């Protein structure tokens, strides 16, 4: 990994770091923030309508269709187990629209209205990152797809921002999700589930958890994988063992054809505290 951190979840202390404060793309590990924001702003039994824009998200996807309805719970399992990009967009558009004060369903949105709702959700992600204590994190997309945006500063100058975080910030976000959020129990429940099946709109779906560490490592109970061409393979996860909880975040862990790099056995092996 080009960047890594091992964090004591109880104290927030960094036990090991490698380029842990260097900003990098983080791919679908982004979705831990999307998940916790949705949990904090919606009830899992609420229904989400699908917009035409959400349905156009690239693979990996659930293949939702405009006008369909899913529960927040169903989309959250789709989001966190299978890492579906359209589920992320649908959830973000629903919450973002509510934050904008909208009353109509997302299925009635124009493309510009959908983008405005997603932008508002990204603002909420960045506000939450500041609240958590992140020092160099910027969210643009709810699914972690690589993105850049142009900001106009108060003095009129232009600033280019990329979707990014640091290994340390990413670990701090997961710490918030499992330790501090009022919805931490639901977050843990969703991210530790191995399989979730549901039927909606006349179709049946099966979601399987792609976090292999839940099976590979004793005590592993949550986490999220990620990959984009820019970010490479990424991972953030937590483990409870011997009365301690540790969080690891890894960014830029290689690119194809190196998907089988054997770094897993070292993930939660803490070196001497620094």
Report each predicted region and the residues it spans.
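Domain-terminus/edge residues, biased toward the C-terminal soluble/receptor-binding domains
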Residues: 155-270, 274
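Active-site-adjacent loops and short helices of periplasmic peptidoglycan-processing enzymes
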Residues: 1-168, 178-181
């Amino acid at each position: 990994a080009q960047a890594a951190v091992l964090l004591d979840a109880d104290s927030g202390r960094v036990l090991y770091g490698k380029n842990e404060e260097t900003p990098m793309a983080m791919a679908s590990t982004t979705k831990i923030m999307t998940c916790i924001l949705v949990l904090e702003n919606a009830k899992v039994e609420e229904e989400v309508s699908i917009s035409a824009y959400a349905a156009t998200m690239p693979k990996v996807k659930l293949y939702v269709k405009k006008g369909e309805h899913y529960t927040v719970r169903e989309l959250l399992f789709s989001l966190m187990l299978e890492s579906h990009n359209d589920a992320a967009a649908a959830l973000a558009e629903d919450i973002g629209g509510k934050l904008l004060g909208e009353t109509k369903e997302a299925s009635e949105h124009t493309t510009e209205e959908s983008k405005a709702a997603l932008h508002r959700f990204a603002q909420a992600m960045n506000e939450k990152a500041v609240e958590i204590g992140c020092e160099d994190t910027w969210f643009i997309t709810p699914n972690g797809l690589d993105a850049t945006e142009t900001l106009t500063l108060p003095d009129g100058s232009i600033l280019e921002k990329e979707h990014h975080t640091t290994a340390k910030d990413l670990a701090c976000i997961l710490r918030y999700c499992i330790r501090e959020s009022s919805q931490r129990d639901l977050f843990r429940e969703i991210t530790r589930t191995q399989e979730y099946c549901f039927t909606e709109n006349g179709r049946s779906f099966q979601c399987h958890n792609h976090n292999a560490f839940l099976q590979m490592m004793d005590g592993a109970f949550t986490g999220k994988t990620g990959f984009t061409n820019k970010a490479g393979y990424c991972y953030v996860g937590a483990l409870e063992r011997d009365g301690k909880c540790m969080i690891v975040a890894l960014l830029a862990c290689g690119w194809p054809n190196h998907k089988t790099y054997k770094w897993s056995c070292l993930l939660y092996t803490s070196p001497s505290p620094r």
